[in-house]
Regions:
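ATP-dependent carboxylate-amine ligase
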Residues: 1-38, 43-51, 63-67, 83-88, ...
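The start of beta-strands in P-loop NTPase/AAA+ ATPase cores
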Residues: 3, 133, 154, 180-181, ...
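Phosphate-binding loop of NTP-binding sites
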Residues: 20-24, 45, 58-59, 71-220, ...
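Short, polar loop motifs at secondary-structure junctions
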Residues: 33-36, 54-56, 71-74, 95, ...
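A generic structural signal for residues located within well-ordered alpha-helices
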Residues: 117, 272-275, 325
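Short polybasic amphipathic segments
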Residues: 254-259
Length: 453
């Protein structure tokens, strides 16, 4: 067993890796300058919560076998400097995941959107089929108590991410996984702070595809023109298999797939999720699960946390929260809800929270992204702008960039709550669907008591 120290142990996925390695019997320690829930509670429950927040170079000595370095840590982090001085092996999160999965069949789900959902669907099917597998996923998935599992299983399912691995290893995380099977779900510019141009962003996927080993399999979204372009450019040396939209119809607002096994009712919303489902099924079939069993399994899939997650279902009101934050995700999520709840009054509320979305240079990418809502709302936090070192945004500029008729913009959470509360409780005709889209929390607003009439 190894002694492993985590620099920035409080990260959402970092602390899950720490817990997974502890379950394997390794001795784990860690530090961070800020640890919030759920990481704080999870670490405390398992005896891994640091006694004090901050960085302590005295924790680093030659008895440590490995350092796992989180993206949150800066280059001048005193613990990192001490580890470098002592020549202790330093791994980014993805490098360590690869280190412990070298002898496994690695499945990597990559792309600009749909990664968490496809990964979750694959996990759900494999569990239903009783296959032994490890995994790493960026959200809580129903039926799984952890986000990271490591064991002696022969397969590992990995949600791939094009964001840099760490402050000292700035290549995208997906570069380190070396998949035997991969999915490319879609391409849409993201992470403007790291990839300032669209070409710079897509170059990362060209590199990823071109460096896949020749005996690997790639399942790609044939409905995405950019995906097709990149596959033709960089994936001619591997087996590339397209997936597309299945045949389906609706029964009582529920999609019903037309399959060889007959009609299959599924519990997901939106064409994008039906596409995601096809990717997951194809991967699982390559892993040895029969097609009929894949469809049996997927019928009971209900989604990952914050992916069109139903949070309110009461008379006259249904509400969903979704992780959507990039323009393509907004469009797909809105379209999904509009299609399933066409007879509802749709109130769509989006929080600008990521570095990209809060950067005025990127806002033009949101042009018409909120079309389809009966009421469209954009919220941003001045505190988030301050933390990210960005200039204040102008409400009129936001309205111009979104180019959506009647768009309301708020930067105060009380004003946002009051507007949504009034709108939800003043509708007298149609039932209401409230769609909350953010990678943040709307400054901690609890939406459950929103309907009072």
């Amino acid at each position: 067993m190894k002694k492993i120290h985590f620099i920035a142990i409080g990260g959402a996925i970092m602390h899950q890796l720490a817990l997974a390695l502890q379950r394997q019997g390794h001795h784990i320690s860690g530090s961070d300058d800020e640890i919030k829930d759920p990481a704080r509670s999870n670490l405390n429950q398992h005896g891994l919560l640091p006694k004090q927040e901050g960085w302590f170079p005295e924790k680093i000595d030659n008895t440590i076998d490995a350092i796992v370095l989180g993206m949150h840590a800066k280059a001048n982090n005193p613990e990192l400097l001490k580890a470098q001085e002592l020549n202790i092996p330093i791994y980014s999160f993805p490098e360590y995941i690869y280190e412990v999965s070298k002898n496994k069949k690695r499945v990597v789900v990559a792309g600009s959107h749909g990664k968490t959902t496809i990964t979750s669907m694959i996990m759900h099917i494999l569990k239903y089929a009783a296959l032994d597998f490890d995994y790493m996923v960026g959200a809580k998935v129903e039926g799984f108590s952890e986000s990271v599992k490591l064991s002696d299983a022969p397969i590992i399912i990995l949600e791939g991410d094009e964001y840099p691995a760490s402050i000292i290893e700035k290549k995208p995380k997906i570069f380190f996984y070396h998949p035997h099977i991969s999915v490319l779900s879609g391409i849409a510019w993201d992470h403007i702070n790291v990839f300032p141009t669209y070409e710079n962003y897509t170059d990362q996927f060209v590199h990823y595809l071109s460096h896949m080993q020749s005996d690997a399999s790639l399942y790609f979204n044939e409905t995405d023109d950019e995906v097709i372009r990149l596959v033709k450019q960089a994936a001619t040396h591997i087996k590339s298999i397209p997936y597309g939209m299945p045949s389906y119809h609706f029964e009582n607002n529920q999609p019903v797939l037309a399959t060889k096994e007959g009609p299959i009712k599924v519990n997901v919303l939106g064409k994008h999720n039906l596409l995601n489902m096809q990717a997951a099924i194809k991967v699982c079939m390559e892993l040895g699960v029969a097609e009929a069993m894949c469809y049996d399994a997927i019928a009971s899939f209900t989604g990952a946390a914050k992916r069109l997650e139903k949070i309110i279902d009461t008379e006259g009101l249904i509400a969903f929260r979704d992780f959507a934050h990039a323009p393509s995700k907004l469009k797909a999520t809105l379209q999904a809800v509009r299609e399933n709840f066409s007879d509802y009054h749709l109130i769509a509320c989006f929080e600008l929270h990521t570095y990209s979305s809060l950067n005025e240079a990127f806002l033009k990418e949101y042009n018409h992204s909120m079309e389809g809502a009966d009421e469209a709302i954009v919220f941003y936090s001045k505190e988030a702008l301050h933390i990210k070192g960005l200039e204040d945004l102008d409400s009129n500029a936001i309205k111009a960039h979104f180019n959506t008729h009647g768009l309301h913009v708020f930067n105060n959470k009380e004003d946002l709550w009051n507007y949504v509360h009034s709108s939800v409780n003043s509708q007298t005709g149609k039932p209401i669907c409230l769609l909350l889209m953010s990678s943040g929390t709307f400054e901690g607003i609890d939406w459950t008591p929103i309907k009072t009439v």
